[in-house]
Amino acid sequence: MKLGRRKFLGLGSAALVGLSLKREKKIEGSFVNDSFQMGHLLRDRASFPEAKRKEKLPVVIVGGGIAGLSAAWRLHKRGFHDFVLLEMNSQPGGNARWGENEITAYPWAAHYVPVPGPKAVYVRELFEDLGVLRDGQWNERYLAFAPQERLFLYGRWQDGIEPAVGLKQKDREQFQRLEERFAAYRNSGSFTIPLELGLSAKDQALDGLSFSEWLHQQGFDSRLLHWYMNYACRDDYGALASDTSAWAGIHYFSSREVEEKGPLTWPEGNGWITRRLLERVSENIRTNQMVHRITESARGVSVFAGDTEFQAEFVIFAAPTFLAPYLLEKFPGLHDFVYSPWLTANLTLDRYPDSRGAEPSWDTVFLDSPTLGYVDAMHQSLRTFVDRTVWTFYWSLAEGAPAQNRQLLLEKDWAYWKEAILHDLERVHSDIRQCVSRIDIMRMGHAMIRPAVGSMFSEERHRLSRLDGRILFANSDLSGISIFEEAQYHGVEAAQKVFKKLHG
């Protein structure tokens, strides 16, 4: 039985459980890292207790994702240690958090970084500091091992995610022609990482179209080509191609150097980077610190978290920008910041399931699935024999309004999502239920900013990124896309501005 997304998500938990009750062994699990209750306190303008104590220091960083950690890393490298980073959750990292069990460490969200090009100066500097890049050479241990990617389509496997099986001559010609278009945009110098180094008004018209509209206008109508473009948008932006700015869609394929090596990955995904950053700045980090108010005066900035008022000269606001109107006094509402909800899950496997004769791959995708597939945390293992593993399963809820999908995440229980995940995997791995012993699920209502049509040249975002007062914004959403390089760039830039203000 093949179910479309709407019909599938319309099934109740009982109906899904009934699909396999007779043959399923008991699978443990739960929702993990849920922090939406705290976020909803801010949304609902809840009252918080008055501060009982004060702490004075030059710099406060709000938010412990990659942007905040990168700001801390840069300050630390400059020899400046008189700052504190406040993180709402018990574990820093944001979209680069990780988990660990008796088998392996594993990612909770971002799981790789493409090999950065020469313009990504800060990322390359970081990777030199972490030992990933030495004397211009990438450490082979951190490059994804082969086989890297596989796609299941038409009852068989193929290497790579771009469809190559079942293509007609028209499909091949369109894939080739589109790659030539992307190469031309790449050579134009307007599509760069970091994004703002190349952003040019001459390409602004592309922002007024959706990516799917642009593809059709250019004469691309291959079903498999549109599936692949749509998959890319769901994977990187949490949005359908029809909801993605054409500029952003082109940027995905035209912004990176043509590089055979890569991507860079670790068992815990980008959590490995988080861990290495924490080794350097852990003394400055305060976890379980929910910031609930920020006020600014001529004397400085006060950040209220828990029972403490942190009095600072400067604040680096590295938390998602959509929180600013709920935290900062007289901060205007935001219109160009739309966020995509995601669900991720980590499945503990006591053995590998049947894969129809295929060798395990790092990244696995199914054609026409509403989900994004899974990555194998043990793929980078140097062990000669691997029997147990953890699969990290990704699902960007891209179809429909983000607010409705956030509500769906909250309304459905763990059993419902467990069945949804297993049902998707069963299309290829028929014995998956006999292999899985645990499924832990993380719900992220505002996982990443969505590069909606008309948003990439947003004056609202550019204005916030140019602010040069006591409060500096630093989240990746200032770029309109949520990728590691942009988060790190904004974090480092904000730290450098603050350091210059303090030291001249």
List the model feature ranges, each with a label:
Residues 68:
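N-terminal Rossmann-fold NAD(P) dinucleotide-binding loop
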Residues 20-48, 154, 160-163, 354-504:
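Conserved flavin/dinucleotide-binding core of flavoenzymes
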Residues 287-392, 428:
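Mid-domain catalytic core of redox enzymes
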Residues 76-99:
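Glycine-rich FAD pyrophosphate-binding loop
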Residues 190-293, 298:
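Active-site/ligand-binding neighborhood in enzyme catalytic cores
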Residues 102-184:
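Dinucleotide-binding Rossmann-like beta1-alpha1 core, especially the glycine-rich loop
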Residues 1-15:
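N-terminal secretory signal peptides and thylakoid transit peptides that target proteins
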Residues 54-65:
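Beta1/beta-strand and adjacent pyrophosphate-binding region of the FAD-binding site
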